[in-house]
Amino acid sequence: MSFDLAARLAERQAADLFRQRPLLQTPQGPQVRADDQELLAFCSNDYLGLANHPEVIRALQLGAEKWGVGGGASHLVIGHSTPHHELEEALAEFTGRPRALLFSTGYMANLAVVTALLGQGDSVLQDRLNHASLLDAGLLCGARFSRYLHNDAVSLANRLRKASGNCLVVTDGVFSMDGDLADLPVLCAEARARDAWVMVDDAHGFGPLGATGGGIVEHFGLGLDEVQVLVGTLGKAFGTAGAFVAGSEELIETLIQFARPYIYTTSQPPAVACATLKSLELLRREGWRREHLQRLIARFRQGAAEIGLSLMDSPTPIQPILVGDSARALKLSALLKDRGLLVGAIRPPTVPAGSARLRVTLSAAHSEAQLELLLEALAECWPQVQADA
């Protein structure tokens, strides 16, 4: 019996859920060329505008000249280079934790933590809107897996009472498709009352949130006692690639010994670690980037309200415009593209059915004038989409 892949693909196309990759023909930045069209992009996760920063580029070049290109082997064989080690130490200091551990991707970091800490007889409790990598990790770890209602401490408490064995509460810090924040103080209090650990994937919080860009944990003034496992990615606000886990000495050593996605993966190129060290320096030195970004967020939300757009409750650079129907979301995205603006339509299964949206993301690299162009285009296009409702 053959795999009927053609039927699966046709079904997805018929439901307006078929996804295609835009071909980027320039570096990351507000002004890009994609699919042979000059566009003003509002869909990148380069929140602080560091992905194409000349100092970061130069650090990568110098790193490649000194350390070569490939990692060569896994960290435990001979792939753990000095730049990797220096970056881990810098990230530990940045997060205020004893140690940090580098991973090649955020997906691998999340998979590594959950599968290394939990097994049969244990419990993992996750927010219903967590990132796919966290949900996959919960399914693969062998523990009892339960999802609590989004950001709902009462729902979490009910599940904590039924938990057995070692219990890990897992949440996004900033929810990637909604832009809202996890209510960490309340969630951590519930977990602590039941002797459970808390793991936060702050992929979208590091950089934009916190007085020094330290993310949602810094934003709420929490520490290692409240959030035992802190995960961050380096391909978003840091503008480079990879991810890290920060925590106690015992946590990091446990991951080195037992986390299969860490043990059996070639290390990232050491030159990338050199670039990330520079981007971390810029993130901490240039506070104006966060300040400018906050002004853009405030202006976008004000302008969107004037247009009558349905926004979600987000204080972050992620500003989703809720459309509902997938076909209408695609139409709004296409209308904007006709006007030289690139904003992606996010549809099921990435988001729940009936909640298709345009995921506007803002960057410190955007100017106020560029943001006004987006608002003007939305004011023109939104009535056309509403007419199809």
Curated annotation (Swiss-Prot):
Its EC number is 2.3.1.47. SUPFAM superfamilies: PLP-dependent transferases. Homodimer. Its cofactor is pyridoxal 5'-phosphate. This is 8-amino-7-oxononanoate synthase. InterPro entries: Aminotrans_II_pyridoxalP_BS, Aminotransferase_I/II_large, AON_synthase_class-II, AONS_Archaea/Proteobacteria, AONS_Proteobacteria, PyrdxlP-dep_Trfase, PyrdxlP-dep_Trfase_major, PyrdxlP-dep_Trfase_small. It catalyses: 6-carboxyhexanoyl-[ACP] + L-alanine + H(+) = (8S)-8-amino-7-oxononanoate + holo-[ACP] + CO2. Pyridoxal 5'-phosphate binds at residues 106-107, 176, 204, 233. Belongs to the class-II pyridoxal-phosphate-dependent aminotransferase family. BioF subfamily. The gene is bioF. The keyword Transferase applies. GO terms for molecular function: 8-amino-7-oxononanoate synthase activity; pyridoxal phosphate binding.
